[in-house]
């Protein structure tokens, strides 16, 4: 059975801000099932922002597990991500989940993968999902050649991804942390 999937999630850190944004399209195979899904949210007392790409039900399971890890480790992002990754590798049910998480707080931006990896990307730029490569290319160009704020870079880059990726639309959810 096919899963609901297809999205673009982008995280940009610049100055004293980190922003994660995502589109709202949910696809089942070649069909758009929903256009206004919220794939980005705030976690742990509004100190962490997170976005997901991949199977929708799988991602919600991961959100719940990740939030529980944040609570258990007093909001320590890296520790919570590593503990979730450990569970992901050892738990039979979790190993079958097909999703990626992009998570960030004032100190770090991380990708938690379906293989149980925790990756801190270069330049604190994260792009995941079907339109991730398009959004990442646009964001890198804007980071290197403009003085735009992080939120503006996310908006413009998601817009470009939405123009070229059939699994990405222009209904964005964007969350921002200032520190």
From Swiss-Prot:
Active site, per annotation: 7
Activity regulation text: Allosterically activated by HslU binding.
Signal sequence residues: none
Gene3D superfamilies per record: Glutamine Phosphoribosylpyrophosphate, subunit 1, domain 1
Primary subcellular site in the record, as a coarse category: cytoplasm
Any one Pfam family match given in the protein's UniProt record, by short name: Proteasome
Keyword vocabulary terms for this entry: Allosteric enzyme, Cytoplasm, Hydrolase, Metal-binding, Protease, Sodium, Threonine protease
UniProt catalytic activity: ATP-dependent cleavage of peptide bonds with broad specificity
Localization per Swiss-Prot or TrEMBL: Cytoplasm
EC class (word): hydrolase
Protein EC: 3.4.25.2
Residues annotated to bind Na(+): 162, 165, 168
CDD domains: protease_HslV (cd01913)
Keyword check for Lipid biosynthesis: no
GO cellular component, one term: HslUV protease complex
UniProt-listed GO biological process terms: proteolysis involved in protein catabolic process
Protein family (similarity comment): Belongs to the peptidase T1B family. HslV subfamily.
Description of how the protein assembles with itself and partners: A double ring-shaped homohexamer of HslV is capped on each side by a ring-shaped HslU homohexamer. The assembly of the HslU/HslV complex is dependent on binding of ATP.
PANTHER family from the UniProt entry: ATP-DEPENDENT PROTEASE SUBUNIT HSLV, METALLOPROTEASE TLDD
HAMAP family (alphabetical): HslV
Name under which the protein is recorded: ATP-dependent protease subunit HslV
Annotated source species: Saccharophagus degradans (strain 2-40 / ATCC 43961 / DSM 17024)
């Amino acid at each position: 059975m096919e899963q609901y999937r297809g999205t673009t999630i982008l995280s940009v850190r610049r100055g004293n801000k980190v922003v994660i944004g995502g589109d709202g399209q949910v696809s089942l195979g070649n069909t758009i099932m929903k256009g206004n899904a919220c794939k980005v949210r705030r976690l742990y007392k509004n100190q962490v922002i997170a976005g997901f790409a991949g199977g929708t039900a799988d991602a919600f399971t991961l959100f719940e597990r990740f939030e529980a890890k944040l609570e258990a480790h007093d909001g320590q992002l890296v520790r919570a991500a590593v503990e979730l990754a450990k569970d992901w590798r050892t738990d039979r049910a979790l190993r079958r989940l097909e999703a990626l998480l992009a998570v960030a707080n004032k100190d770090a931006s991380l990708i938690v993968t379906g293989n149980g990896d925790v990756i801190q990307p270069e330049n604190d730029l994260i792009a995941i999902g079907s339109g991730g490569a398009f959004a990442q290319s646009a964001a890198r160009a804007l980071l290197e050649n403009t003085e735009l704020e992080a939120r503006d870079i996310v908006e413009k880059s998601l817009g470009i991804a939405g123009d070229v990726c059939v699994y990405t639309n222009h209904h964005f959810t964007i969350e921002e942390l200032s520190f």
